[in-house]
Amino acid sequence: MLGTVNTTGMQGFNKSERCPRDTRMTQLLFPVLYTVVFFTGVLLNTLALWVFIHIPSNSTFIIYLKNTLVADLIMTLMLPFKILSDSRLAPWQLRGFVCTFSSVVFYETMYVGIMMLGLIAFDRFLKIVVPFRKTFVKKTAFAKIVSISIWLLMFLISLPNMILNKEATASTVKKCASLKSPLGLLWHQVVSHTCQFIFWTVFILMLLFYTVIAKKVYDSYRKFKSRDSKHKRLEAKVFIVMAVFFVCFAPFHFVRVPYTHSQTTNKTDCRLENQLFLAKESTLFLATTNICMDPLIYIILCKKFTRKVPCMRWRTKTAASSDEHHSSQTDNITLS
């Protein structure tokens, strides 16, 4: 077993030497795009932080939203390191820091956010499908325990990726895989497959939850013969959240497995490896834009949030006067 791991490690290192990475796109275009996402994310998530500070954590829904915000803020703070590293505006030592710490934290918080979005879908599912049934999963204590468990799980999974590395040099930091020890390469592959499992499990569950929610809402509208534009917009909200989740995260997870395989074996053609690298970076950027999308989800799903946003208070009060006739199932889509 150890011999196999050592061989894999040497293969990954040797391939780094014979297959130089094409970084023209990642060095010129992506740093500019990430800079735009960074400043937009700082603006939106700072506003969201200010709003959530003024909202008590008295429901499971709010707790999940706040944890999503924390994950997004940490992801946002990791972006400057990637921008400076990819653009080659910083010394090679920063690249070593990115490989061993900031990118690990970035991925850790991304999957925390993914699981939190799954819990938000589960929370909406319970409130609409079984709104009056009392169960422990609706208690704030449950939400806090689950949230802490998720953070702890991802930390424990990610920690070896920070530790199982060789000494950084100007040559080894060109590819993060070359910086990893043989055991680190093996662990990185295990983590990659684990994260794939997390994403697709959450996605399938979200799809089931929102399908049932949509059916419930549709049945409610049909029962009360209500087909006005307000009801149609509420129907659409269910699918907007699902669409954002899929568009941001699915492409990256289609690419990640073959990319990780290309980094941990010596069987991938050099040209294909560079194509997979570019595909991974492109879809990773798409996944990163989720830090700008989540604040929109807060506005769509949480009226407590919109009531605290200064520019939306008047709109919320105006809309409230026309919402009195809506059913409780419809309200549960947007109320916490």
UniProtKB/Swiss-Prot annotation:
Q: Which residues lie on this side of the membrane: Extracellular?
A: 1-32, 82-100, 166-193, 259-281
Which GO biological process entries does UniProt record here? G protein-coupled receptor signaling pathway
The cross-references to InterPro entries, in alphabetical order and at most eight, read:
GPCR_Rhodpsn, GPCR_Rhodpsn_7TM, P2Y13_rcpt
Q: Which GO terms describe its cellular component?
A: endoplasmic reticulum; plasma membrane
Q: Give residue ranges on the Cytoplasmic side.
A: 54-60, 122-144, 215-237, 303-336
Record's bilayer topology term: Multi-pass membrane protein
Please give the chief subcellular localization of this protein.
membrane
User: Which positions are glycosylated?
Assistant: N6, N14, N266
Disulphide bonds annotated for this chain are C99-C176
What GO terms are given for molecular function?
G protein-coupled purinergic nucleotide receptor activity
Record-annotated membrane-spanning stretches: 33-53, 61-81, 101-121, 145-165, 194-214, 238-258, 282-302
Which keywords are on file for this protein? Cell membrane, Disulfide bond, G-protein coupled receptor, Glycoprotein, Membrane, Receptor, Transducer, Transmembrane, Transmembrane helix
Give a yes or no for keyword Zinc in this entry.
no
Q: Where does the record say this protein resides?
A: Cell membrane
What tissues is it present in? Answer: Highest levels in spleen, liver brain and kidney. Lower but significant level are also detected in intestine, stomach, skeletal muscle, testis, heart and lung.
Function noted in UniProt: Receptor for ADP. Coupled to G(i)-proteins. May play a role in hematopoiesis and the immune system.
List the PANTHER family.
P2Y PURINOCEPTOR 13, P2Y PURINOCEPTOR-RELATED G-PROTEIN COUPLED RECEPTOR
Q: To which protein family does this belong?
A: Belongs to the G-protein coupled receptor 1 family.
Full protein name: P2Y purinoceptor 13
Give the species this sequence originates from: Rattus norvegicus
Biological classification of the source:
Eukaryota, Metazoa, Chordata, Craniata, Vertebrata
